[in-house]
Amino acid sequence: MKFTAAVLLLCLAACSAPVEPLMIKQFTLRDQENSVADDPMVQNEKLRRLHGAVSIEERKQRLGQYYAVLWNADAAAEKEIVFRYQQGASGSRIKEMRRALPTGSSSGKEEFSIIGDNYFKNGRVLAWKIDLTANGETIASKQSYLWE
């Protein structure tokens, strides 16, 4: 009986996957129309992004690109997420956004967005890189295919 329980626990432990320290989810909101031809998940995401925007101008300012960053790191460390990106109209200039993460939490979600006037004037994001640092040291990094 004990042997069976030990084998079962060993099998369950072998099936568990390691936790990724950094995961990125991208979404581009291109138009305000909710088409029936869209996938239900896309329809829901559009509705979520446009929620609360009443006027046409408010809805237009929500158009652009959204990056949701899911992170896992040591709770005691001083953590920061750095989002570097290049836009179509800015040439080779690299722009940067930073978010300090609360000490004491070991996981969470941060969102970066390039929307509204920034999106319309400078164009869409062509390449990006996101780094997760803990105590000043990079512990995880993800980037788009075009990032150099």
Protein language model regions, located:
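Sec-dependent bacterial lipoprotein signal peptides
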Residues: 1-16
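Bacterial Sec signal peptide processing site at the extreme N-terminus
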Residues: 15-32
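Contiguous beta-strand segments within globular domains
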Residues: 38-73, 109-114
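Extended, low-complexity, turn-rich repeat/linker tracts enriched in Gly/Pro/Ser/Thr and Asp/Glu
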Residues: 73-77, 120
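Extended low-complexity, serine/threonine- and proline-enriched intrinsically disordered segments
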Residues: 77-95, 130-132
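Short proline/glycine- and polar residue-rich coil/turn motifs
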Residues: 100-108
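Short glycine/proline/serine/threonine-rich loop/turn segments at secondary-structure transition edges
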Residues: 119-125
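Short beta-strand elements
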Residues: 138-148
